[in-house]
Each structure stands twice: as structure tokens, then as C-alpha cells.
Amino acid sequence: MITIGIETSCDETSVSLLEDGNKILSNLVSSQVEIHKTFGGVVPEVASRIHVEVLNRLIELALEKAKKEFTDIDLIAVTQGPGLIGALWIGIMAAKTLSLALNKPLIGVNHLEGHIFANFLGEDPPTFPFIALIVSGGHTEYILVEDIGVYKILGQTLDDAAGEAFDKVARILGLNYPGGPEIDKISKMGKPIFNFPKIKCDRELDISFSGIKTAVLYLVRDLKKEGKEIPVADIAASFQERVVEELLERAFLALNKFNIKTLVVSGGVASNSYLQRRFKEESRKEGIKLYIPPPYLCTDNGAMIACAGYHLYQKGYKSDLYLSANPDLLLGER
């Protein structure tokens, strides 16, 4: 079965062809990072315009790379939300057009669902139930995944997502956008010598990054007032360590609470080298089976959408031509 996956929820246009739910035939990504870097963040209007410019050609190129024709497509999967409303509609209209023209089934996919299913793109997928941690530019959530399409949110960010916090702290430190890779890189040259405050929330699996972000801001401000040099690498390493340790602590709280031995981590921040090292260390120590996709599947991509769409369709889920973009789509909402 050939599934085409279309992802346009934010600033990446991506199209993928997948065979039988796990074999990637093509996975093309057109990134807008260099364009949005000028503005220090994603400009929704600009993102939508670029999706319009590149999507049709990207679909053709994905088919060429997979050595497939339009008539070979059996299922069309597309990101329905959450995301930027204009950007989402570009992908959905393309998917609807394909569905109508080819008379093939259509399935709307939650973007977060896609990140979870990025871990199913291989020969040894996770078995249910498992705990999923999604850490990206727009989301930080702990999820109990009981089955395909059956999710329970256990905890989430109360303010910034992890990736957003990385971007804001990078800006405070004078680093380039996007901040995650910049902090990851410069942290290797520093030491975590600053003790940023632990995160405290009323619910044990919720998380908040505003306190750490403010602590970084005040530290930099005070050092400047005193005329001291800003130890950017040390501050970055200290911030990164605190964020990762907080994410790790809550992940293992969730595993212990539900007596589960499988942990799935995905989203753009999951490609952070320190995060990967710490999660692997702790998982080995505690006997937890850990899944983290390769970096190219951590960031937004069409393959994860095709994979999620395939599994949802096999489970009996499907959409129709009334499918709409939903920028606030909840996980599990159909």
C-alpha cells in the first residue's frame, strides 16, 4: 500500500511516499529556516506563501524519487492541525485535490500524532501501551498512548514549549535562530556552572519554562550591569542541562506511575545531543526501552504524517472532502 504524506503545519513543506506504513520511498523537505531567520521567528503569512510556491513541485519530485506515478497512490494523509491556519490549509487543499482526482481515500492526521508515529518508521516499532514525550517548537506534552488513536494527556507545558524556550534563551544570549541547534552546539564548549531554579507546578507532570527563561534574562542583565563578560557557552550549557533534566524527571515519573517500560521521545528538540545522551543513560539504567527517531525524522516531515495516516486508516479511521484545518486540534480529536 502506497501512502503519500503531506506536512505544511508551520515552516517546513514536506512530502513523503511510504510503502506499507514503514518503508520510506521518498521524504522531501523544503525548509524555510533561512527566510524566517531574518525575522527572528516564523512569519505565518510568509510561511503560507512559500508553501503555495513549492508544494506542487515537491509532490512531483517525491513521486519521481520514489519511482511512482500518481495512479500508484492508495492513500492520502495530510496534517490537519495543530499549526498555522493558513499553512495547514495549503496542505489540506492539495490533499483534497489528490483524493478527488484519484478517487483515493483521505485521512487527516494530528501533527502530534505524526511525531509519535515517526518512531514506527522502522523494523522494530514500539508496542502499546507506551509513554510518549513530544518536545518541539510548539509543543511539550507527556502522553499515555494506549493504542492507535487512543491517547491520554498526562502533562504539558503551562507556557512556552521547550523549543520556544530554546529560541528565546538563544535570543537573550545573542545566538541565531533557530535557537535549539545553536544552544546544543555552543553548550559543548561550556560547563553547566549556573544553578537555574527547578521547575515547580501544581500537577507533577506539567512543566513550565518561564522561570528558567527569566533566570537567564536576569543573569545576563546583571552581568552586563556589572560590566562583566557574558559566558554564553556556560549559560547555554546550564540552561540546556536544567531543561533536559526536568523533561527526563517527568518522563520517568510517568513511566513509574503507569508501570510502563517503553518510552517514545519525538519532536524537533528530541534531536538535541545532550537530551539524547541523558535519556539513553537513564533508560539503560532503569531497564526502559527507549525510542527516539533519527534527527531527520525528529523535525517536521511528511513521512511521519504518512506513517500515522497509514496506521489510522488500517484501524478504520478516515476523513472526507469536508476535512478542515484546525489550528487548535487536540490529540485524539477527529
Curated annotation (Swiss-Prot):
Copy out the cofactor comment.
Binds 1 Fe(2+) ion per subunit.
GO MF terms, alphabetically ordered:
iron ion binding; N(6)-L-threonylcarbamoyladenine synthase activity
What is the top-level taxon of the source organism? Bacteria
Q: Identify the residues that bind substrate.
A: 134-138, 167, 180, 184, 272
GO BP terms, alphabetized: tRNA threonylcarbamoyladenosine modification
Q: Where does Fe cation bind?
A: 111, 115, 300
Q: Which NCBIfam families match?
A: gcp_kae1 (TIGR00329), T6A_TsaD_YgjD (TIGR03723)
Q: Which family, according to UniProt?
A: Belongs to the KAE1 / TsaD family.
Q: What is the name of this protein? A: tRNA N6-adenosine threonylcarbamoyltransferase
